[in-house]
Amino acid sequence: MKKADSEQVGGVILQYLREMGLETLLNEHRLIQAWDKVLGPSVSRYTKEIRIYNQVLFVTISSAALRNELMMRRTELVSRLNAEAGAQVITQIVLK
């Protein structure tokens, strides 16, 4: 039997995460996980560190040539990573 005011489990969990202040952390984790999926294994191999601070994604890349190529695609990468994470998590990328 279904109650008239029943909710989907996903909605209840999302509401709980918002109330506990954990939604941002979850979205940041999703975005960091999306780095490998969006950029693939060839870029992941040269990725040394990824972190997010104040909506800025900081990525350390060990290859100067790859870092320069990614710098030219930063705007596109911000859009693709946010889309993969399902939220506006970052506003810019800093490559080191």
Model regions and ranges:
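N-terminal presequence-like segments and adjacent domain-start helices
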Residues: 1-36, 48-50, 75, 85-95
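Short edge beta-strands and adjacent turn/loop segments
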Residues: 34-58
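Short, charged/polar surface micro-motifs in flexible loops or helix N-caps
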Residues: 41, 64-65, 87
